[in-house]
């Protein structure tokens, strides 16, 4: 119990320190004595509006013979379903909405930063950036994933889920506990680092050379942005499947 308590306290302190990581000048709101990252909320609302608008457009008038738009969204849904089924197994059904939401939010957020350099928008104070450019967003998504796989394991196995911490031998208890903390950290830092680096490269090139020159870098950013969204969603599904099956 002392090991678990120390690990939790250390993890909480680490998350608090991470939340203060800044690159560039952030745009803040003061709400009820709290300092809120306004640029994350603004760009997140833009991303959510794009996703909601696209969803409404896709289901507004479904056809027996699908249109091009309907075909596209059906393909996206099938792709997400296949990823979930491959990683989670036969009980993937209830998790498709969660995995799909993660994938689509991260994908559109990443692409918004790759296609449109938010930092060039002039604000009285601070600057805008893609939602996934902020460590608080990626940590929040990673923690949601952690909650999801704990919930999946406890729902499937009950308290027997915690037997995994002493398998194959109780000596590995500290390492197995540490693994639950390293998973969200690796998820969040991988996504944050890649998206931040991509946006910084594009902004620097735009400030130094004509618009045409950074275009190849922007295309590379689009590719890596899509890959990062897929990696995050795939790992999230794999962690959920692992917690339900009980194997590593």
UniProtKB/Swiss-Prot annotation:
Keywords noted in UniProt: ATP synthesis, CF(0), Chloroplast, Hydrogen ion transport, Ion transport, Membrane, Plastid, Thylakoid, Transmembrane, Transmembrane helix, Transport
Pfam families: ATP-synt_A
Molecular function as annotated in GO: proton-transporting ATP synthase activity, rotational mechanism
Membrane topology note: Multi-pass membrane protein
Entry keyword annotation includes Ion transport: yes
Signal peptide: none
SUPFAM superfamilies listed in its UniProt record: F1F0 ATP synthase subunit A
Highest taxon of the lineage: Eukaryota
GO cellular component: chloroplast thylakoid membrane; plasma membrane; proton-transporting ATP synthase complex
Gene3D superfamilies given in the database record: ATP synthase, F0 complex, subunit A
Bilayer-crossing regions: 39-59, 96-116, 135-155, 200-220, 221-241
Predominant cellular place of this UniProt entry's protein: plastid
InterPro entries the record matches: ATP_syn_F0_a_bact/chloroplast, ATP_synth_F0_asu, ATP_synth_F0_asu_AS, F0_ATP_A_sf
Protein's cellular compartments: Plastid, Chloroplast thylakoid membrane
Keyword Plastid included in the entry's annotation: yes
Assembly and interaction partners: F-type ATPases have 2 components, CF(1) - the catalytic core - and CF(0) - the membrane proton channel. CF(1) has five subunits: alpha(3), beta(3), gamma(1), delta(1), epsilon(1). CF(0) has four main subunits: a, b, b' and c.
Family: Belongs to the ATPase A chain family.
HAMAP family: ATP_synth_a_bact
PANTHER family linked: ATP SYNTHASE SUBUNIT A, CHLOROPLASTIC
Function of the molecule: Key component of the proton channel; it plays a direct role in the translocation of protons across the membrane.
Protein name: ATP synthase subunit a, chloroplastic
Organism listed in the record: Pelargonium hortorum
Lineage start: Eukaryota, Viridiplantae, Streptophyta, Embryophyta, Tracheophyta
């Amino acid at each position: 119990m002392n090991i678990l308590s120390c690990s939790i306290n250390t993890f909480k302190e680490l998350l608090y320190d991470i939340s203060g990581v800044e690159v560039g000048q952030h745009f803040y709101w003061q709400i009820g004595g709290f300092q809120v990252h306004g640029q994350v909320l603004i760009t997140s609302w833009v991303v959510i509006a794009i996703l909601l608008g696209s969803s409404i457009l896709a289901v507004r008038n479904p056809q027996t013979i699908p249109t091009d738009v309907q075909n596209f969204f059906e393909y996206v849904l099938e792709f997400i379903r296949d990823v979930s089924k491959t990683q989670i197994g036969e009980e993937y059904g209830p998790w498709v909405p969660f995995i799909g939401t993660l994938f689509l939010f991260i994908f559109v957020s990443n692409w918004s930063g790759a296609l449109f350099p938010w930092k060039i928008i002039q604000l009285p104070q601070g600057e805008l950036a893609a939602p996934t450019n902020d460590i608080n967003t990626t940590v929040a998504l990673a923690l949601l994933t952690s909650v999801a796989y704990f919930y999946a394991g406890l729902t499937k196995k009950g308290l027997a889920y915690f037997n995994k911490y002493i398998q194959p031998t109780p000596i590995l208890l500290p390492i197995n506990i540490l693994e639950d903390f390293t998973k969200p950290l690796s998820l969040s830092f991988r996504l944050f680092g890649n998206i931040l680096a991509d946006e910084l490269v594009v902004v620097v090139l735009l400030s130094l050379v004509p618009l045409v020159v950074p275009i190849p870098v922007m295309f590379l950013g689009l590719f890596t942005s899509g890959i990062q969204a897929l990696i995050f969603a795939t790992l999230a599904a794999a962690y959920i499947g692992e917690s339900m099956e009980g194997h590593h």
